[in-house]
Each structure stands twice: as structure tokens, then as C-alpha cells.
Amino acid sequence: MAASTNGTSQGVRGAMKSSDPLPLTVEELTAPWFTKILGKPVQDARVVEAIHGTASKILLELTFEDSADVPMRVCVKGGFNPALTVIPYMLAVYRLEAEFYYHVAPTIRMPLPPTLYSGTDTINGQGIVVMADLKSQGYTFGNPLETWPVDRVQTSVEQLAILHASTWGSTPDDIPWASQTVSLRDAILGLAAPEAWEKQFAGETRPPVPNHMMNRERMTTAFQALWKPSNSTLNCLVHGDAHIGNTFISPTGEPGFLDWQVIHTGSVMHDVSYFIIGALSIENRRNHEKGLVQSYLDTLFRAGGPRLQVEQVWDEYRKHTFHGFAWALATPMMQSREIVHAMTERHCAAIVDHKSIELLVGTEE
């Protein structure tokens, strides 16, 4: 079962805001539950691996009562870590990803894991997606420590263009379910609070941030300037966390995006700049980023969006480059030190190259 090129099928099974409670523990992922959601008798559900991160990924092998049906490997994604599910906004994140696979994935032509079920409930507040286990099919996953070749990054930004064109011009009022979750902005401000900042940048293991970016107040001001309401016409539904660590690569080398947990309406350049800068080496980014932005814009137009040229969006790209500074604030509980340092180096170099801070705080000459 290869990754689908047009999302899930129009007949995706699932239910949003069901009054039937969804499982909150791995032990509740039973054969009777799979029988219920899949609509075919499941004889056994064997847990192969449990991976607990921001969301839990539970890999299982399903065997069916009908011997003619071959066993199936699936990945169940949702909130199955009790240490996290007690945090209300974490459940909101899981629900948001389920909403994406239910509402949006069937409508867009981009590589996505085939989805067997997507649901949310109003009892536990859980959000669950049951998808194909890509790992068992030979897929690999993006590693922030390993930059990508330019052609693969081009393929990825063209996929983002297809996503963006599908909801071009949308506002939070147009997609209300995508605005009812935890704010990334609140999370960043928490990480930039005085005590957290001091802890993050104390000692020799601090992220490789240039000295002029060590002014906490100035960096917070730049974030707030980036988040100010604008008259940008580049708004639509965005991935929100489009970095190399949230990708898969098929056995034939085709990339795709995963982890749709913070989708929201915002500027397309949030996704485009964040992905390009984090996925390429600094040298390749400097040599190719304008061409990649133009490739994105060309695909956006072919997919039904407006006809735009790089010069029309370049300042927006430069502004949203600053979002990558959030990597410097990521704690060891969020990402490994090696990944934080690698991504911080790439993003800070771009912030300097594009004079993003000066542009945001109004001091650019």
C-alpha cells in the first residue's frame, strides 16, 4: 500500500466529534475496536512497537477472521501517553491532525499516508488517525541532521504549493476547526520567557546563536512584529511545522509531509521559508532559494492560485525567515541537542542573510 498521491479516498472512514469515546491507552487498541472502525472482523491486533513523542505512534499487525485477507501493518497516531494526555491542549493537537485527514486530505493531490480511519470524540477529547505503516513498506523519514538535495526540496515546496492553492485566501472564519487549537505563538513566548531563556543559553552547550541575537527583548519584539495582523494576500491553510523532520521518503525517493498537528490559516511564506532554510545546506540555500521560491509560485499558479513573481513575495519570505529562530529555543525534551544546533545554525544564517530582524523591527537601512 504505497503513499497515496491524492490524500485519502473520498470515502474515508471516521467520525468527528463522536459521542462514542475513543481509546486513550495502548491496551484499548483491541481487535473488537479495529473491527468496529474498519467494518470488517479483526481476529487479532498485535502491538509491534510503541513510539511516544509529541504524539504516540503505535505500530500494530492486524490479522483478520477471513483467512483470505492478508495481515495488515498499521500505525495508530494519537494521544496514548498519560503524561501528555492530561495536558488539555495536547489533546487539541491530536484532534487537529485527525480533522486534517478527515476534511482536507481527500481533497488535495499530494503524497500522504493512506488513511484507514480518522476520528475525534467529545467524551475523552481524543483524536486518532489509523494509517498505513510506512516503515514496514520501506519508507524512510527525514532527519534534520541530513540536509537534502535541491531537487528533492523543490519537489517538496511544489507539494506545499498544491496544499496552499486548495484553500487560497482562507481566513480562520472559513476553516473554524483549524483555529481551535493551541497557539504556536504562546509556546514560543513561553520558551522566550526570562527564566527559560537564561536556562537555554547558559553554558557552553547553548545553541549557536550570533551574539547580536542574544538580546531576549529584541528577539521577542521581532516575533511579535512577525505575528502582527497584516494586509497580506498570501493567506491560506498552512502546514505550520513544515520541516525536514516531519517528512517521509518513499522507496523511489519521493518526499511527502507528515505531522499535520499545528495546521492553521496564515501566510504561505511561513511554510515555504521554514522548509527551504531548514532542509538545505547554508551554501545550497544561498545559491538556490530564489529559484525554489519561483518554482513554488509557478506550481501555485498551475494548481489554481494567483500568478506571482518572486519580487512580489520576497519581503514576506524575508520576514517569515525569522520564525526559524524558534529552533534556538527548543529544549532537550523537544529535540536532541545535535538537531537543535544544526537547525539553529541554518536558520540563524538565513536570518542574517535576509536582515529579517531589521525588516521586522523597522531598522533596515
Predicted segments — roles?
Residues 99, 103, 262-265, 269-305, ...:
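Active-site activation/catalytic loop segments of kinase-like enzymes and analogous catalytic loops
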Residues 135-138, 142-147, 226-230, 242-243, ...:
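Flavin-dependent oxidoreductase catalytic core characteristic
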Residues 141-149, 257-259, 276-280:
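Short helix/strand-bridging catalytic loops that position acidic/His residues to coordinate divalent metals
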Residues 48-190, 268:
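Conserved ATP-binding subdomain of kinase catalytic cores across diverse folds
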Residues 51-64, 75, 220-268:
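Active-site acidic catalytic loop and adjacent metal/ATP-binding pocket
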Residues 2-46:
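Juxta-kinase regulatory segment immediately upstream of eukaryotic protein kinase catalytic domains
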Residues 2-8, 15, 139-239, 251, ...:
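ATP-dependent phospho-/nucleotidyl transfer catalytic cores
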Residues 151, 155-158, 237, 242, ...:
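Generic recognition of stable, solvent-exposed alpha-helical segments in well-folded globular domains
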